[in-house]
């Protein structure tokens, strides 16, 4: 009896143990990452030929304690290598693990290699050559703490390499894991199997090989036992011949069918090639088709299983499309696949919850470094009057109502950017803004008392409903999380895409950036204030302080201002403002852009202006500003400096976003100024519910 070890992916150990026992293995013992077992020579070859789950089959040769590199050398040399392989064979060493002595795996591999070579040369035998790419013998050494385990890798290449997939192709899951996913899916051979996101077809090919009794090792060309002196070629040929007979019989007798589709024509072509090389190409129909086009290939029966490994994202900006994808798949399953089973393998349980289905079973497994889950569902048969419920239905209804109200209004006003929803329902705490054919969803960060998983799931429901109600492509939705911003954090950079979208606002053309910053470059609540500035600016010298991207300057310029001066501390936003001005034909000396600390510039400037717009931050303590600024505390000082620059008969439009702001009217009067609040006049329909989003004043000489 041979003592052997089969390695596998984490989470598949018990499944592998059952498989090995079915092959005839005895004394199976599960450990993390594999199974120890025993068997005769025939079982050695059968496990290599038939195991769908094992990554490698190892023949343990011994262990040694490693307190120095000499201990490792002597421990390896103690094995009778000349009985393991002939000097004419090539070999390679795979070394894993480190300790205080062996701190580099390459160094460990070199010491093992030296010990094996010296074992031959000391017996005056020819020195065996190292071949890292295609060796006849692979030696595996695993160092754990002070113990090195030495084994012969009888697999050669990993057993996931079945021989049907081009090694250059990218596979999101290995064939061994794919086989486990098939086994755990609840699918029964003889019933239909469909993968709507099949990629290169690995799940379907593994299922078809399982269903037709085709051994996973049948198409492999190289094995790790070819240079092993104890290799029994006669028994191996018997095992191989039996596998070939069973494969022919299984294929001839199999009557059901497999269906695969993917939106990428290139991977579908690769899938067809892989299936043909695996010997089961005639059983699988592959189509180039998006999930949105998915239909039941057997509407009259029999029932089958939908099995897939859908994509998942690690970045926030990829989630809207994936949320929409999973929500869509859930709706299609309910509408078209009643009575079928569904099994999905994913690294994102949150995305799976977008299906709006209840899982019957779930399994955990590792896909490389990723913790993954496989969930199995049974889709209830639909009745004629059954109607699938939409996620976040209350939110969807409100958004639909708002869309009907605002879409026509915006078209009549001549604006492309407006707010569709602003936390209208407390439990759906987001803002939804439309920018032409794009949508930005801003999630207001939930309080810490709210369960994070529930909050994330609600956000996913909101995104799915938004895409459905507005009928937009998922890649046209941008998701952001918004917290209360202070000072410089309000302009925090989020990305580096540099993608700008041209939008119209009345007669102005403006650039917005929906992804790189928390704000987009256009404050929608100030839309009417900007229009008023345009109407007030004809023939006047206009000053825009804390200008941001200069959209107010654009309106003033288009309104006929004699000159415009735009001041902001940020070079990025001034360059943006320059682009906005250029887009509207506002160039030349009449339109100045100044990079400066606005408060310092205001104190030192000695020019005169007819119309001044200032929209300062509520609070700022930027390192580049000389002093901390508080709009409630400091607005009179601000007005005193502004008055000095205001030409006789001129007007200041002053706006800020501080809730509960109180204008010091008595203090203004002492400065010889008076204020008229125009907040309500500057709030458009889409911000009517949020009357404290800003306050706005016209200030003139008393």
From Swiss-Prot:
Organism (species)? Escherichia coli O6:K15:H31 (strain 536 / UPEC)
A single GO CC term for this protein reads: cytoplasm
Q: Which UniProt keywords apply?
A: Cytoplasm, Methyltransferase, RNA-binding, rRNA processing, S-adenosyl-L-methionine, Transferase
Q: Which family does it belong to?
A: Belongs to the methyltransferase superfamily. RlmKL family.
The answer to keyword Cytoplasm applying to this record is: yes
Q: What is this protein called?
A: Ribosomal RNA large subunit methyltransferase K/L
Question: What InterPro entries does its record include?
Answer: 23SrRNA_methyltr_KL (IPR017244), DNA_methylase_N6_adenine_CS (IPR002052), RlmKL-like_Mtase (IPR000241), RlmKL-like_Mtase_CS (IPR053943), RlmL_1st (IPR054170), SAM-dep_methyl-trfase (IPR019614), SAM-dependent_MTases_sf (IPR029063), THUMP_dom (IPR004114)
Membrane-crossing residues?
none
| Signal peptide start and end residues | none
Q: Where would you say this protein principally sits, based on its record?
A: cytoplasm
Q: What is its EC number?
A: 2.1.1.173, 2.1.1.264
UniProt xrefs under PANTHER family? RIBOSOMAL RNA LARGE SUBUNIT METHYLTRANSFERASE K/L, RIBOSOMAL RNA LARGE SUBUNIT METHYLTRANSFERASE K_L
Q: Which SUPFAM superfamilies match?
A: S-adenosyl-L-methionine-dependent methyltransferases
Q: What class of enzyme is it?
A: transferase
Q: Does the keyword Methyltransferase apply?
A: yes
Reaction(s) this enzyme catalyzes, per UniProt: guanosine(2445) in 23S rRNA + S-adenosyl-L-methionine = N(2)-methylguanosine(2445) in 23S rRNA + S-adenosyl-L-homocysteine + H(+); guanosine(2069) in 23S rRNA + S-adenosyl-L-methionine = N(2)-methylguanosine(2069) in 23S rRNA + S-adenosyl-L-homocysteine + H(+)
Query: Pfam families recorded for this chain?
Result: Methyltrans_SAM (PF10672), RlmL_1st (PF22020), THUMP (PF02926), UPF0020 (PF01170)
Q: What does this protein do?
A: Specifically methylates the guanine in position 2445 (m2G2445) and the guanine in position 2069 (m7G2069) of 23S rRNA.
Where located? Cytoplasm
């Amino acid at each position: 009896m041979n003592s052997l070890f089969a390695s596998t992916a984490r989470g598949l150990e018990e499944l592998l143990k059952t498989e090995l026992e079915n092959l005839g293995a005895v004394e199976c013992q599960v450990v993390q990452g594999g199974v120890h077992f025993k068997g005769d020579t025939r079982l050695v070859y059968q496990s290599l030929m038939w195991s769908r789950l094992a990554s490698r089959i190892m023949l343990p040769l011994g262990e040694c304690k490693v307190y120095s590199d000499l201990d490792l050398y002597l421990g390896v040399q103690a094995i009778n290598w000349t009985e393991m392989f002939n000097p004419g064979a090539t070999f390679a060493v795979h070394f894993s693990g480190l300790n205080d002595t062996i701190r580099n795996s390459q160094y460990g591999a070199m010491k093992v290699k030296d010990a094996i070579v010296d074992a031959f040369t000391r017996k005056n035998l020819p020195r065996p050559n190292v071949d890292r790419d295609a060796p006849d013998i692979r030696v595996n050494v695993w160092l754990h703490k002070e113990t090195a385990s030495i084994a012969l890798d009888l697999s050669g290449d990993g057993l996931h390499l079945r021989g049907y997939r081009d090694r250059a192709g990218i596979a999101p899951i290995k064939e061994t894991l794919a086989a486990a996913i098939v086994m755990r899916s609840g699918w029964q051979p003889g019933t239909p199997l469909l993968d709507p996101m099949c990629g290169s077809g690995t799940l379907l090919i593994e299922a078809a090989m399982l269903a037709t009794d085709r051994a996973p090792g049948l198409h492999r060309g190289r094995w790790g036992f070819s240079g092993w002196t104890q290799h029994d070629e006669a028994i191996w040929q018997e095992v191989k011949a039996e596998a070939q007979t069973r494969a022919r019989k299984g294929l001839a007798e199999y009557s059901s069918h497999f269906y695969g589709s993917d939106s990428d024509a290139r991977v579908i072509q690769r899938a067809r090639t892989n299936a043909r090389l695996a010997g089961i190409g005639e059983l699988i129909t592959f189509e180039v088709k998006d999930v949105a086009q998915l239909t039941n290939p057997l509407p009259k029966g029999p029932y089958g299983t939908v099995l897939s490994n859908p994509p998942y994202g690690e970045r926030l900006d990829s989630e809207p499309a994936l949320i929409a994808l999973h929500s869509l798949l859930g709706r299609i399953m309910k509408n078209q696949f009643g009575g079928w089973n569904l099994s999905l393998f994913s690294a994102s349980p949150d995305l799976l919850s977008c299906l709006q289905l209840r899982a019957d079973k779930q399994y955990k497994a590792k896909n490389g470094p990723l913790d993954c889950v496989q969930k199995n569902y049974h889709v209830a048969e639909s009745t004629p009057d059954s109607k699938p419920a939409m996620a976040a239905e209350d939110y969807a209804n409100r958004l639909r109502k708002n869309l009907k109200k605002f879409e026509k209004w915006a078209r009549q006003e001549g604006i492309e950017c407006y707010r569709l929803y602003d936390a209208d329902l407390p439990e759906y705490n987001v803002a939804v803004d439309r920018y032409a054919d794009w949508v930005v969803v801003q999630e207001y960060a939930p309080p810490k008392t709210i369960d994070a998983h529930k909050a994330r799931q609600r956000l996913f429901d909101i995104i799915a409903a938004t895409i459905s109600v507005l009928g937009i492509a998922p890649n046209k939705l941008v998701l952001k999380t918004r917290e209360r911003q202070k000072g410089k954090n309000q302009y925090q950079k989020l990305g580096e895409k540099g993608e700008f979208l041209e939008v119209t606002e009345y007669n102005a053309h403006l650039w917005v950036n929906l992804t790189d910053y928390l704000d987009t470059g256009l404050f929608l609540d100030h839309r009417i204030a900007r229009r008023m500035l345009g109407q007030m600016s004809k023939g006047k010298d206009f000053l825009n302080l804390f200008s941001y991207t200069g959209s107010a300057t654009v309106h003033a310029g288009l309104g006929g201002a004699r000159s415009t001066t735009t001041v902001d501390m940020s070079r990025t936003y001034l360059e943006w403002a320059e682009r906005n001005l250029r887009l509207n034909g506002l160039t030349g000396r009449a339109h100045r852009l100044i990079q400066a600390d606005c408060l310092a510039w205001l104190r030192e400037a000695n020019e005169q202006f007819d119309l001044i717009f200032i929209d300062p931050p509520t609070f700022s303590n930027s390192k580049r500003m000389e002093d901390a600024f508080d709009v409630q505390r400091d607005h009179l000082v601000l007005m005193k400096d502004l008055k000095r620059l205001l030409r006789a008969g001129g007007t200041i439009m002053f706006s800020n976003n501080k809730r509960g702001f109180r204008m010091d009217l008595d203090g203004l009067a002492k400065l010889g100024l008076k204020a008229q609040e125009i907040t309500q006049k500057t709030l458009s329909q889409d911000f009517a519910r949020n009357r404290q989003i800003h306050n706005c004043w016209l200030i003139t000489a008393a």
